[in-house]
């Protein structure tokens, strides 16, 4: 399994960079974090081993983390409710400078920066709770703070920066300097092998000359410091490759060409940035040449946890809005929440909101503990939270009917409470695209999920491996599968007494245990059936990952309910697990009984233009500009000239 590969092997026709499919896959593979030095609940789950001991007892924050975090949240809540008008941000599509300054004065720019470097030193848990709080007030504020800290300069510096870099940059970043992360280009999204931006060594290697255009630079319009990914050409003394640089956003040659506008998150400072021979000192490279993509991917292992936090917050807000409206609105003689059609939606929102918070809190606490490798758990959390929160918001809009489609401003203008259901729907939509689209996330997780299989049997299915190496792989595979496969037949999930301490939740944990083994068996069947072609069965792999995500959420919901110890929490966990199990069972059916092949064939006919007759009778107001602007011809007004 590699990321990504198109079914059928058709190579993209339009190339702005002469990069083969194989080269793209190789770059993605060498940029992976290959070591598994700590246990992983997610990895074990996909292998059919339900390691409840890795998440139960549910981890808890330290007293110091709680004291520091609760005090910070209290100040943040007071600031938001007293000093920030979310309607102003939504109306003007901009966070006022006074608000940004107030956030900086409060310490919000350094929430997850260590106190050693002037930050607030919040744990992952309380950093997530702070983002949830700000995101529930207005999404643009949470986006500003998370883009600055979760993927901006502070996070890669935390893991890969030198001590000198940390002492130089982290204090101002924790105080009043805003950062941004720049990877995407007009023709480069999930395939960084096509990157055009270059950093050419100059001055005998003492500096680099950075040139290129970066797109969708969240915070880039107002940022002071940037972490930029650029390709260093291979030359004598330079290994080359995609590398990470800290760049002064005000340096000569840095130009913000355009401030982008989106369907949601109004107020986001996202733009297009051009670099024209910008000098970057060698000491401002993070890590070594060629390590940039690896740094970016490993940074996201924990950086991705910001999105589950804001998605969980949105789901919780949707529950409040749905509950209040379903109790207030009366149709056919009773509140609409008493009609089964609406009651089912309320139940879905309630169960999902509980599960999303459980996933977010457990993932964050596991990151704080540093006892487990959470790359799979964090990726599953991001994928699951973004998909489910969107469905929750859609159901809220449906429950509120016409008022769900009406803006908060319009509702207030005619004397009703400004419940911005349509706003949360618009704001959440990008979560399925931000920091790895759901489709790419499924492929990334699938690659990690089958890592054990590839390590023991990869040479058996690889096309260019010599026979002696295949023979060795066959021996390894026989030894591994001879022990592994029999263990997938029976387990604790078949014993009625298993997990008895969980009471009413025990049947659901037994289901997770049984189903994890079933998931592992089906993954193996897919590998046996398609072998090297499995990487092209993206729909199959996507369903495998979706099943794993549901099992992860069920596990988190159960251990959280057990920790909380209330009947209410137990009720919601049972509710959610029942809903999730039905989705899982359907996904298993779809693994082997589907229309994947016929749908793929039809899509190729669509691409070939065979069905263009369907497009007749409509007008296209989009104009005739290119669908993708070339990197050397990026247009737009100059927001901040270089």
Predicted regions and their residues:
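Flavin-dependent oxidoreductase catalytic core characteristic
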Residues: 3-148, 157-158, 163-164, 171, ...
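Short, glycine/charge-rich beta-strand/loop segments that flank catalytic centers
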Residues: 146-153, 184-187
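Beta-sandwich/jelly-roll carbohydrate-recognition scaffolds of carbohydrate-active enzymes
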Residues: 168, 186-200, 215
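A short, Trp-centered hydrophobic/proline-enriched beta-strand micro-motif
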Residues: 175-183
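Short Gly/Pro-enriched turn/cap motifs at secondary-structure boundaries
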Residues: 187-190, 216-219, 236, 262-269
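Sequence-specific dsDNA recognition surfaces
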Residues: 194, 254-262
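A short core secondary-structure module
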Residues: 206-207, 211-256
């Amino acid at each position: 399994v590699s990321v990504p590969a198109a079914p059928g092997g058709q190579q993209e026709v339009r190339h702005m960079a002469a990069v083969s499919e194989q080269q793209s896959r190789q770059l993605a593979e060498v940029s992976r974090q290959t070591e598994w030095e700590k246990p992983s609940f997610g990895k074990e789950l996909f292998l059919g081993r339900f390691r409840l001991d890795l998440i139960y007892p549910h981890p808890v924050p330290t007293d110091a983390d709680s004291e520091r975090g609760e005090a910070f949240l209290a100040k943040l809540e007071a600031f938001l409710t007293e000093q920030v008008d979310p309607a102003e941000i939504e109306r003007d599509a901009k966070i006022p400078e006074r608000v940004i300054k107030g956030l900086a004065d409060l310490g919000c720019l350094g929430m997850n920066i260590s106190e050693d470097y002037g930050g607030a030193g919040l744990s992952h848990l309380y950093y997530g709770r702070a983002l949830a709080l700000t995101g529930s007030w207005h999404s643009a504020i949470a986006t500003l703070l998370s883009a600055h800290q979760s993927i901006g300069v502070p996070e890669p510096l935390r893991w890969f920066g030198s001590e000198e870099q940390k002492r130089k940059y982290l204090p101002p970043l924790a105080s009043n300097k805003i950062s941004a992360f720049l990877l995407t280009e007009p023709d480069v999204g999930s395939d960084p092998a096509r990157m055009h931006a270059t950093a050419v060594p100059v001055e005998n290697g003492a500096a680099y000359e950075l040139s290129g255009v970066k797109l969708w630079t969240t915070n880039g319009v107002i940022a002071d410091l940037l972490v930029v990914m650029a390709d260093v050409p291979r030359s004598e003394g330079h290994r080359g490759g995609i590398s990470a640089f800290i760049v002064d956003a005000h340096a000569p040659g840095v130009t913000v060409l355009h401030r982008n506008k989106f369907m949601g998150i109004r107020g986001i400072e996202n733009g297009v940035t051009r670099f024209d021979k910008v000098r970057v000192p060698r000491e401002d490279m993070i890590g070594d040449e060629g390590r940039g993509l690896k740094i970016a991917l490993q940074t996201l292992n924990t950086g991705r946890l910001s999105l589950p936090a804001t998605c969980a917050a949105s789901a919780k807000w949707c529950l409040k809005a749905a509950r209040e409206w379903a109790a207030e609105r009366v149709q056919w003689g009773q509140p609409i929440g008493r009609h089964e059609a609406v009651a089912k939606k309320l139940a879905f929102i309630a169960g999902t909101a509980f599960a999303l918070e459980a996933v977010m809190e457990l993932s964050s606490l596991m990151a704080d503990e540093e006892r487990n490798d959470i790359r799979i758990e964090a990726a599953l959390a991001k994928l699951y939270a973004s998909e489910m929160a969107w469905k929750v918001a859609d159901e809220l809009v449906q429950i509120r009917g016409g008022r769900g489609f009406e803006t908060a401003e319009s509702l207030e203008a005619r004397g009703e409470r400004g419940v911005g259901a349509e706003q949360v729907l618009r704001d959440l939509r990008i979560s399925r695209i931000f920091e790895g689209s759901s489709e790419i996330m499924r492929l990334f997780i699938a690659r990690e999920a089958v890592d054990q299989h590839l390590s023991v049997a990869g040479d058996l299915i690889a096309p260019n491996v010599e026979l002696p190496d295949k023979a060795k792989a066959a021996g390894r595979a026989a030894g591994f599968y001879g022990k592994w496969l029999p263990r997938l037949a029976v387990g604790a999930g078949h014993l009625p007494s298993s997990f008895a301490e969980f009471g009413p939740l025990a049947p659901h944990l037994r289901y997770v245990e049984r189903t994890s083994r079933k998931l592992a068996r089906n993954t193996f069947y897919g590998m046996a059936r398609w072998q090297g072609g499995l990487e092209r069965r993206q729909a199959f792999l996507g369903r495998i990952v979706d099943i794993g995500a549901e099992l992860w959420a069920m596990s988190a919901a159960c251990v959280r309910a057990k920790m909380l110890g209330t009947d209410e929490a137990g009720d919601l966990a049972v509710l959610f697990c029942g809903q999730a199990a039905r989705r899982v069972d359907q996904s298993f059916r779809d693994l082997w009984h589907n229309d994947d092949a016929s749908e793929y064939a039809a899509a190729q006919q669509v691409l070939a233009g065979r069905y263009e007759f369907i497009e007749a009778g409509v007008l296209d107001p989009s104009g005739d500009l290119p669908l993708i602007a070339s990197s050397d011809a990026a247009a737009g007004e100059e927001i901040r000239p270089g």
